[in-house]
Design a protein with these regions (language model features):
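Phosphate/adenylate-binding glycine loop and adjacent helical scaffold
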Residues: 1-223
C-alpha cells in the first residue's frame, strides 16, 4: 500500500495507490473518491463466523464505541486509487507492523493493508473507566503490513529507553505493545480539579509513543 498526501491542502486527503488484487481495510465512512477499478464492500469487524461473529461485533461496538463494520477495498487492476478523509483534521502517519506492534486509542485508525490486522483488547475495569476514549477495549495490531493512523493536529513521537513518562490521555494516539501503561487521575481527584489536568497515561519501559498536539475533547467543549 502506497499513500500520498497533498501538501497544498491545509487539511489534506490521503490517497492510496493499489496494484491489482491488493486489499486494504479503511475506517468506515472515510472514502472521498476512487477510480472505477476499485471496489468497496462492508465486512463485520470481528473474527469468527455466522451469528456468533455478528453478535460479537455488535456487542463490542456497544461498549467500545467502535463501529461494528469495516470497509474492505480491493483494486481489480493496477493503478487503482482511493482517497480518504480522516475523522479529524490533522497529520496522518504510517505504523509499520511486524517486529513492532502497537495499541491505538479510539479514533486513530484510518487504513490497514491486507497483510496486517487488528483486534480489540479488553482492558481492565480501572483503565476502561478512566480512559474515556476506547471504553473497555483498545485497538491492538497484529501481523505484518502498514497501518495509517490519524490525529487531531500534528503528531510527535516520544521514544522511551527503560524510562517513564506521563501523558494526558486525550493526546495519546498510539504506543508500542512493549510498554506497560496505566490510566489514572493526575495527582488525585481534588488536585485534578484544581489544576485542570484530568486523566493521564503513565507509560514505562522501552518503546514508542505517538501524541497529538491538539485535544479534541477540549475543542468540542468550546463549541
Amino acid at each position: 500500500m502506497q499513500f500520498f498526501t497533498d501538501s497544498n491542502m491545509q487539511f489534506p486527503l490521503v490517497e492510496l495507490s493499489l496494484n491489482q488484487g491488493e486489499t486494504v481495510f479503511i475506517q468506515r465512512g472515510s472514502m472521498v473518491y476512487h477510480t472505477p477499478n476499485v471496489t468497496l464492500s462492508t465486512k463485520l469487524n470481528a473474527s469468527g463466523s455466522g451469528l456468533g461473529r455478528f453478535v460479537k461485533a455488535v456487542g463490542r461496538s456497544m461498549v467500545s464505541g467502535e463501529s461494528s463494520f469495516i470497509t474492505q477495498v480491493v483494486s481489480q487492476s493496477n493503478n487503482g486509487y482511493i482517497a480518504l478523509a480522516p475523522d479529524s483534521p490533522g497529520q496522518v502517519i504510517p505504523l509499520y507492523l511486524g517486529e513492532k506492534q502497537y495499541r491505538l486509542n479510539d479514533g486513530a485508525f484510518l487504513a490497514l493493508d491486507g497483510t496486517a490486522y487488528y483486534t480489540m483488547e479488553l482492558q481492565s475495569v480501572g483503565k476502561a473507566l478512566f480512559g474515556g476514549q476506547g471504553g473497555f477495549f483498545v485497538m491492538t495490531t497484529q501481523g505484518q503490513g502498514t497501518l495509517l493512523a490519524n490525529a487531531y493536529g500534528s503528531i510527535k513521537k516520544i521514544e522511551l529507553n527503560n524510562q517513564e513518562v506521563t501523558i494526558d490521555n486525550a493526546h495519546v494516539v498510539a504506543w508500542s505493545q512493549t510498554l506497560d501503561y496505566d490510566i489514572h487521575l493526575e495527582n488525585g481527584f481534588w488536585q485534578s480539579i484544581g489544576t485542570g489536568e484530568g486523566v493521564v497515561n503513565t507509560f514505562r519501559g522501552t518503546g514508542e509513543i505517538y501524541v497529538q498536539s491538539l485535544n479534541l475533547q477540549t475543542f468540542a467543549g468550546l463549541l
